[in-house]
Amino acid sequence: LLKAKSIIDGGKYRLVSDAQAFANGWLNDTLTETLWQVAMTGPDDLGNAYSYFIYNTSGKAGEDSPRFVPEDWVLDLYAKNDIRYQAWFSNRDITTPVVGNLTLLVKYPGNPKLYSAVTNYVNMPKVFRVSEMYLIAAEAAANRGEDIVASKYLNDLKVARIPDWERRDYTGDNLTVAIRN
């Protein structure tokens, strides 16, 4: 709890609450709340691709062929006005054996600086973000029986992510579930 709290209170890394800044931060690997990400400098200096989620070799709309489509229970973990939902999910036409318009995970669209023509779905891995420190602090406080402190950290995170979020007090199992979700 103390280590996470020191990072949160240090002020160097702040939660991003602006939807456009959040989406651009994931696309361009410029998310200001990132404590550490693996650096890549161009098309010849790449890590893993995340094409599993979208996979579109032509770059044309309507030709997505994902290997993974999130189920409703995953999508339901996010409020529709949550800036994470807006940045990480998109309704797309797909051309797998199932044809239609589905909500896909687009969290790793590919940083334009890391490809030359059609996206390669490579983004710099964001290994640690301050948002995770809020969840670590909430979980640590909950494990110590400090539900009010845990609720504060969880609510601080949700206020930054979900416009019009109303703070609430969590306790017991409801607190644990809220942190994990």
Annotated model-derived regions:
Residues 1-65, 76-181:
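Acidic/polar-rich alpha-helix caps and helix-coil junctions
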Residues 70-71:
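Residue-level signal for threonine
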